[in-house]
Structures are given as C-alpha cells and as structure tokens.
UniProtKB/Swiss-Prot annotation:
Organism for this UniProt entry: Arabidopsis thaliana
Keyword Transmembrane annotated: no
Chain intervals for the UniProt region annotation (Disordered): 109-147
GO function terms (MF aspect): DNA-binding transcription factor activity; sequence-specific DNA binding; transcription cis-regulatory region binding
Motif (Bipartite nuclear localization signal 2): 109-117
Pfam family for this entry, one: Myb_DNA-binding
Keywords recorded for this protein, A-Z: DNA-binding, Nucleus, Repeat, Transcription, Transcription regulation
Record motif Bipartite nuclear localization signal 1, residues: 62-65
Domain of life according to the entry: Eukaryota
Any one cellular-component term (Gene Ontology): nucleus
Gene name in the database record: MYB59
Gene3D superfamilies: Homeodomain-like
Protein name: Transcription factor MYB59
Bilayer-spanning residue ranges: none
Induction context: Isoform MYB59-1 is induced by jasmonate (JA), salicylic acid (SA), gibberellic acid (GA), and ethylene. Also induced by cadmium (Cd).
C-alpha cells in the first residue's frame, strides 16, 4: 500500500491565505507552526507560514524605508557581527532579518556602482581641452625650436642668438661672425689698383706747364727790373 505524499502549495500568498493565517496565529500563537499549518487548511508548510508571518504579517513590523539611524546601526552591527542577520534584527525592533539583508545588499551594490561610475561629461571635456592645448603647445614649441635649429645649421645668426651666446660664453663667441665679416671685406678690398684715366694725365701736364711759366716770369722780373720800369715810364 503506497502512501500518497501530500503536495504543498508554493508561490506567492494570496490575500485570503494571509487573512486565514492571521486568524489562526491569534488563536494558537506564533510558536507551533506545523500545527497552525495543518489545522488552518492552508496547504502550506510550517516554515512557509512562519516566514510569512515574521516578514509580512506581524503587527509590529515597520513599513517603509529605513531611517538614517537604522542604516547607521546596520552598518555598525554588520562590521561587528558579519552576516548574522537574525542577531542584527533583534537590535532593530520592527525590522526583519530579511529586510536588513536586502538593505545591506542594496547598499553594497550602490557603492560598487559609484566606484565604477565614469567621469562626468564636464570634467571629461575639460580634460580633453587641456590635453589638446598641451599637444598644441608642444607642437608649436617643437616647430619654433626646429626652425631655430635649422637656421643655426644653415649658418644664420640672429641678434637674439648673438646676445645669448655673449651672455653664455663671453665676447669671443662672435669671433666667427667677425672673421666672416672681414673675409667678406677682403674680397672687395684686395683688387689691384686701377690705372688713371688719360684725361687725368693731361690735366697734370697742363698744371705743370702753368707752374713753369709762372716760375720763368718771376725769374725775368728779378733779373731785369730796370727794363720793366723804364718801359713802363715811357708809356
């Protein structure tokens, strides 16, 4: 002869089941759950009746969100006792162990999400702008330095370069520039002298003839003064 195993109801509780359980708990108390489940005709296990009463139907339960004081107490007790939810629940009247456990898991989930949360768009855009400005500045600096280096390699000396080298190494630094300058002048000054033109020699001969005539005239006056005076007296 086979014993037919009784099947118990599972799943969500209905409103009629909640009312029936409350009535029988008031009659027989909240200790003998197997007996309450059997005499009530709920077709539920004693464990299921107890959990339904403790977590949802007990008149002393608090409804709604936990207060900041309760949340702080949960965190402190969990740090002290760990996951002993029933023990923690006894320190929070009106709160069940299941409710406290759910709060703890929600709290840890939010904390993990905050750590993984990306940066805000404003801070991200400011960082992008600052990085682009840094890149542009480095490129500009590199371009100017490259140009300066190229000019130095080509032998070009600007005034800034000369004064900078004077400050660093003294006045001898500009010696190469000075040598180059005199070498350039020597290119223009070392030509052979040009021959004098023909008209310059003609002018010199004319001036020489005039000088000779003036000398002869003065000589004649000195030698024959009376003749000139006599002749002038006649006239």
């Amino acid at each position: 002869m086979k014993l037919v195993q009784e099947e118990y109801r599972k799943g969500p509780w209905t409103e009629q089941e909640d009312i029936l359980l409350v009535n029988f708990v008031h009659l027989f108390g909240d200790r003998r759950w197997d007996f309450v489940a059997k005499v009530s005709g709920l077709n539920r296990t004693g464990k299921s009746c107890r959990l339904r009463w403790v977590n949802y139907l007990h008149p002393g339960l608090k409804r709604g969100k936990m207060t900041p004081q309760e949340e702080r107490l949960v965190l402190e007790l969990h740090a002290k006792w760990g996951n002993r939810w029933s023990k923690i629940a006894r320190k929070l009247p009106g709160r069940t162990d299941n409710e406290i456990k759910n709060y703890w898991r929600t709290h840890m989930r939010k904390k993990a999400q905050e750590k993984k949360r990306p940066m805000s768009p404003t801070s991200s855009s400011s960082n992008c702008c600052s990085s682009s400005m840094t890149t542009t500045t480095s490129q500009d600096t590199g371009g100017s330095n490259g140009k300066m280096n190229q000019e130095c390699e080509d032998g070009y000396y600007s005034m800034d370069d000369i004064w900078r080298e004077i400050d660093q190494s003294g006045a001898n630094v500009i010696k190469p520039v000075k040598d180059n300058y005199y070498s350039e002048q020597s290119c223009y000054l070392n030509f052979p002298p040009l021959a004098s033109p023909t008209w310059e020699s003609s002018l010199e001969s004319i001036w020489n003839m005039d000088a000779d005539e003036s000398k002869m005239s003065s000589f004649a006056i000195d030698q024959f003064p009376l003749s000139f005076e006599h002749g002038s007296g006649r006239l």
